[in-house]
From Swiss-Prot:
<dbReference type="GO" id="GO:0090336">
    <property type="term" value="P:positive regulation of brown fat cell differentiation"/>
</dbReference>
<dbReference type="GO" id="GO:0006468">
    <property type="term" value="P:protein phosphorylation"/>
</dbReference>
<dbReference type="GO" id="GO:0043066">
    <property type="term" value="P:negative regulation of apoptotic process"/>
</dbReference>
<dbReference type="GO" id="GO:0007346">
    <property type="term" value="P:regulation of mitotic cell cycle"/>
</dbReference>
<feature type="domain" description="Protein kinase">
    <location>
        <begin position="38"/>
        <end position="290"/>
    </location>
</feature>
<feature type="active site" description="Proton acceptor">
    <location>
        <position position="167"/>
    </location>
</feature>
<dbReference type="GO" id="GO:0006915">
    <property type="term" value="P:apoptotic process"/>
</dbReference>
<feature type="modified residue" description="Phosphoserine">
    <location>
        <position position="261"/>
    </location>
</feature>
<keyword id="KW-0597">Phosphoprotein</keyword>
<comment type="function">
    <text>Proto-oncogene with serine/threonine kinase activity involved in cell survival and cell proliferation and thus providing a selective advantage in tumorigenesis. Exerts its oncogenic activity through: the regulation of MYC transcriptional activity, the regulation of cell cycle progression and by phosphorylation and inhibition of proapoptotic proteins (BAD, MAP3K5, FOXO3). Phosphorylation of MYC leads to an increase of MYC protein stability and thereby an increase of transcriptional activity.</text>
</comment>
<feature type="modified residue" description="Phosphothreonine">
    <location>
        <position position="23"/>
    </location>
</feature>
<protein>
    <recommendedName>
        <fullName>Serine/threonine-protein kinase pim-1</fullName>
        <ecNumber>2.7.11.1</ecNumber>
    </recommendedName>
</protein>
<dbReference type="Pfam" id="PF00069">
    <property type="entry name" value="Pkinase"/>
</dbReference>
<feature type="modified residue" description="Phosphoserine">
    <location>
        <position position="98"/>
    </location>
</feature>
<keyword id="KW-0723">Serine/threonine-protein kinase</keyword>
<dbReference type="GO" id="GO:0106310">
    <property type="term" value="F:protein serine kinase activity"/>
</dbReference>
<keyword id="KW-0832">Ubl conjugation</keyword>
Amino acid sequence: MLLSKINSLAHLRAAPCSDLHATKLAPGKEKEPLESQYQVGPLLGSGGFGSVYSGIRVADNLPVAIKHVEKDRISDWGELPNGTRVPMEVVLLKKVSSGFSGVIRLLDWFERPDSFVLILERPEPVQDLFDFITERGALQEELARSFFWQVLEAVRHCHDCGVLHRDIKDENILIDLNRGELKLIDFGSGALLKDTVYTDFDGTRVYSPPEWIRYHRYHGRSAAVWSLGILLYDMVCGDIPFEHDEEIVRGQVFFRQRVSSECQHLIRWCLALRPSDRPTFEEIQNHPWMQDVLLPQETAEIHLHSLSPGPSK
């Protein structure tokens, strides 16, 4: 059954990663002005990352998200093959944006004197996973399994493309309420994936692994698995397991809801204190709890269409 589901879900991750050298996006300042191509709508959210507005592409009325990032807030920079210096977020998004539905797509970008503007796809109707859980409480395990599989596939896709997200959390996952598909968003804390140790971290602390809290060092893949464990706990219990550094370092997991023993086992495995004791992505997908995953459309029909959609974001 798992093999058939893998084959059915293959479209979510089978397409190749975007090739930076093959990209057809011209540098932002060589294109028509932003204002002539996009109509800017209401503010969707703001924070340390900048501000995100809803918008419409004038040419075809496509809904988009328009993200403004001030240059003086950008800590990590990258370079495109043509030598253009851009935020690392642009480099990472261009690597992961092609041929895969589980990661938000970068449609365009513009450089301004004091900022960069990123044009991103915007599904409708949509709600982030944080708001979804806040409104509806802990998820049924069948729904959590479908969501978790999709997030896992998105993270695997990123790693296959040489990208480490570094801020996997419920607020950075969008749910397309019509299609039952999830999308990983916000690569502002991301980095190029490497096998050596990382000594910097700009993600969300309560999702960070104990080795970062204790030693300010971590490896990308095992840290991602820890964050996935936090996320799965959040899905099935309705809240994260740890709030303080001491709790993260101690790593004792208590379940506040009735959760199956198989799901508990997977969560505890992902939250192993020793990074080398955590499962690989393949081991997670082969875990007994991960069998019989609903397809996204099945998820929408069974779990989402019967619910009144929350506010769009």
